[in-house]
């Protein structure tokens, strides 16, 4: 009987050859590119007079630098306009499909690719973006890569990689009402640490994982990188197949039946051996909020800010630095902390179900005085479907701004930024110093529904209070 993990199976299937020094040449089945990490890669190809090996296996979109308030061309930021124009030119030159401004399929790369059915079980996926691990939700092995590796994939459709160890994170039970995939992954990162996954691929499994929707699974895998893992994945199942079926790039007819048969064979075998295994109880997890400057510095809504003096010695200094930077006092509750800005969006939580859950909290309420709150759909498709459901009107009526798709305030590469010492309640994935555009800006990570609750009350709030009403 086979005793292999999904990671083993996908790795072996895409292995081209062993390289001197012990690494492996790995074929990449899907290469996603955007405007930020691709220009230098294309320049390197041009210098060496190389073409793109398999243009049909590369797909491009624009997301990081696009303004979300006005996407009329040319952009008011000349650098952003230049980056977009460069990507357009490179895609045209090399015959790469580009989902650009004005396209009904444009969006944040890790949102739009799954929507189109581009991401499928058993694939290897690469993109010049840290959160490429998102695609592991489909039973793919997905890596974020640097610019030089983007060049290598364009030129050869392969990468030199070292095989990872595999840690299975088994989550028992079922998430409570008001607890979401974002809370679960923040809890996992808190438990294992931001460096706990170094050298590992994370396999997320167990009843609590299996009960998640595909969009929830994408949230989980999206943030595997924040726990130090090189990638994260979930075994494909009927939930996966139902999501993919009928999408533009999904197999059709007899090819669909063949694909299903193969996809089912990919799941880790019952006798598979893992390098490490962790078991958690999903039913005990509460709404979770970060208080510090790493995604691992998270606590449940009912806890207080940790006192650095009572933490392990290797965590004390960073906790002290975090408290000072965030202007939060040890032993004070996180619930009730005031906020200035609320952001719902990003490749972590900018999908339709995220907006739906947040809208349930917002409906019939009003954004608190002095709070700036905005919603940024993850793609044109998300925006269209949200409008069809009337979600935009719910948010607008409550006092939120409704924006065009893009990465927005997840990172400081477009006009959506914090100012000065503002503190945000954000559904994004990173709370590093300066991450949201101001060198002194502060970020509290939480689920979209928790962000919505914070916007209504003007402070960190247990979303479950709204769900009881």
UniProtKB/Swiss-Prot annotation:
Keyword Iron: yes
InterPro entries in alphabetical order: 3-IsopropMal_deHydase_lsu, Acnase/IPM_dHydase_lsu_aba_1/3, Acoase/IPM_deHydtase_lsu_aba, Aconitase_4Fe-4S_BS, Aconitase_4Fe-4S_dom, IPM_dehydratase_rel_enz, IPMI_cat
Record Pfam families: Aconitase (PF00330)
Keyword Iron-sulfur: yes
Catalytic activities: (2R,3S)-3-isopropylmalate = (2S)-2-isopropylmalate
Cofactor(s) for this UniProt protein: [4Fe-4S] cluster
Keywords (A to Z) from UniProt: 4Fe-4S, Amino-acid biosynthesis, Branched-chain amino acid biosynthesis, Iron, Iron-sulfur, Leucine biosynthesis, Lyase, Metal-binding
Residues that bind [4Fe-4S] cluster: 347, 407, 410
UniProt GO MF annotations: 3-isopropylmalate dehydratase activity; 4 iron, 4 sulfur cluster binding; metal ion binding
CC cofactor note: Binds 1 [4Fe-4S] cluster per subunit.
GO BP of this protein: L-leucine biosynthetic process
Top EC class, one word: lyase
SUPFAM superfamilies given in the database record: Aconitase iron-sulfur domain
Pathway: Amino-acid biosynthesis; L-leucine biosynthesis; L-leucine from 3-methyl-2-oxobutanoate: step 2/4
Oligomer status and interactors: Heterodimer of LeuC and LeuD.
Protein task: Catalyzes the isomerization between 2-isopropylmalate and 3-isopropylmalate, via the formation of 2-isopropylmaleate.
UniProt similarity note: Belongs to the aconitase/IPM isomerase family. LeuC type 1 subfamily.
The protein's name: 3-isopropylmalate dehydratase large subunit
Organism: Prochlorococcus marinus (strain NATL2A)
The encoding gene: leuC
């Amino acid at each position: 009987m086979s005793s292999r993990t999904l990671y083993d199976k996908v790795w072996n299937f895409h292995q081209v050859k062993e390289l001197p020094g012990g690494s492996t040449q790995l074929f990449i089945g899907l290469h996603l590119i955007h405007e930020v990490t691709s220009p230098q890669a294309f320049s390197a190809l041009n210098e060496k007079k190389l073409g793109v090996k398999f243009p049909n296996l590369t797909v491009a979109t624009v997301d990081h630098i696009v303004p979300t308030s006005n996407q009329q061309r040319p952009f008011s930021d000349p650098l952003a306009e230049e980056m977009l124009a460069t990507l357009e030119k490179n895609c045209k030159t090399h015959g790469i499909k580009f989902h650009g401004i004005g396209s009904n399929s444009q969006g944040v790369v890790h949102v739009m690719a799954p929507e189109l059915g581009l991401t499928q079980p058993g694939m290897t996926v690469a993109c010049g973006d840290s959160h490429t691990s998102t695609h592991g939700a489909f039973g793919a092995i997905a890596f974020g890569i640097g610019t030089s590796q983007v060049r290598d994939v364009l030129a050869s459709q392969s990468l030199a990689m070292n095989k990872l160890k595999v840690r299975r994170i088994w989550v028992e039970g079922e998430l409570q009402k008001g607890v979401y995939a974002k809370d679960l992954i923040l809890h996992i990162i808190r438990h294992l640490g931001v460096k706990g996954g170094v050298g590992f691929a994370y396999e997320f499994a167990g009843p609590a994982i299996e009960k998640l929707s595909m969009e929830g699974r994408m949230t989980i895998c999206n943030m595997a990188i924040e726990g130090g893992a090189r990638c994260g994945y979930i075994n494909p199942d009927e939930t996966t197949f139902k999501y993919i079926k009928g999408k533009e790039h999904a197999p059709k007819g007899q090819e669909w039946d063949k694909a299903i048969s193969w996809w089912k064979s990919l799941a880790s075998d019952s006798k598979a051996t893992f390098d490490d295994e962790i078991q958690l109880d999903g039913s005990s997890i509460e709404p979770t909020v970060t208080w510090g400057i790493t995604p691992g510095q998270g606590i449940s809504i009912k806890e207080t800010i940790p006192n650095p003096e009572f933490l392990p010695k290797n965590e004390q200094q960073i906790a002290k630095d975090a408290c000072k930077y965030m202007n939060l006092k040890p032993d004070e509750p996180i619930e009730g902390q005031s906020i200035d800005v609320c952001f719902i969006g990003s490749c972590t939580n900018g999908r339709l179900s995220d907006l739906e859950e947040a809208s349930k909290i917002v409906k019939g309420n009003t954004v608190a005085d002095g709070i700036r709150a905005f919603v940024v759909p993850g793609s044109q498709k998300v925006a269209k479907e949200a409008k069809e459901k009337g979600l935009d009107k719910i948010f607008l009526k409550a006092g939120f701004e409704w924006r065009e798709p893009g990465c927005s305030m997840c990172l400081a590469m477009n006009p959506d930024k914090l100012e000065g010492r503002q503190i945000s309640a954000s559904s994004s994935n990173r709370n590093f110093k300066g991450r949201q555009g101001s060198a002194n800006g502060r970020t509290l990570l939480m689920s979209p529904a928790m962000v919505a609750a914070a916007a209504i009350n003007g402070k960190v709030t247990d979303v479950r209070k709204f769900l009881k009403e």
